């Protein structure tokens, strides 16, 4: 039975005192033997951590003490081993780096689509489906009908939009990512660029894999995750990939 709970979490929220939050957050993580990395910025919090059930519950309880973080978005999966080596709380300019000033998902964002409704949306031929993740993530798994922007980092996404998407041509755009945070910013960016009907998968791929039965799923392959598991399968269990020691990209011995 899996011993560790892996918790991916984020929330876009005004945290003017984010620098002051760093130490008490580090303290609660260390006290409860929670490993992983959390990012703090004036726009919110983001990261993935792992611990025992009790440790993760203690962290979530700590968030509830701050009314700004009581409804932090989180998704859980499990691993037999601790997938992280260290405990880190970092201060950043953005909790997910797009590099474009003024994009604020708290003020404008696309339409959330529940996992149970996602299949019907992306099967619609009038909907242009974009995977907002990096190229190496997409190579090991993505949704049917999805376009690969072939980006190496999220910073390249605005350039992809500028060169390849047109509000007059692409009337309906649906986007997805691992846990939902990149889609928050990417849909906010598209709305700012004049796109009207913009949708994104609520809770990301991880929530979809959790809620949609595999026999009904339009997901193909495995889902890359930013921890020692490298990828998870449709049951959210560690997949067949490992990390190449030379290039640091996911590899598999499977035929």
Curated annotation (Swiss-Prot):
It comes from the Bacteria. Residues 123-217 form the Rhodanese domain. The keyword Oxidoreductase applies. Pfam families: Rhodanese, UPF0176_N. InterPro entries: Rhodanese-like_dom, Rhodanese-like_dom_sf, TrhO, TRHO_N. It is an enzyme of class 1 (oxidoreductase). The active site is at residue 177. It catalyses: uridine(34) in tRNA + AH2 + O2 = 5-hydroxyuridine(34) in tRNA + A + H2O. Its EC number is 1.14.-.-. One of its GO terms (molecular function) is oxidoreductase activity, acting on paired donors, with incorporation or reduction of molecular oxygen. GO terms for biological process: tRNA modification. Keywords: Oxidoreductase, tRNA processing. Catalyzes oxygen-dependent 5-hydroxyuridine (ho5U) modification at position 34 in tRNAs. HAMAP family: TrhO. Belongs to the TrhO family. This is tRNA uridine(34) hydroxylase. It comes from Photobacterium profundum (strain SS9).
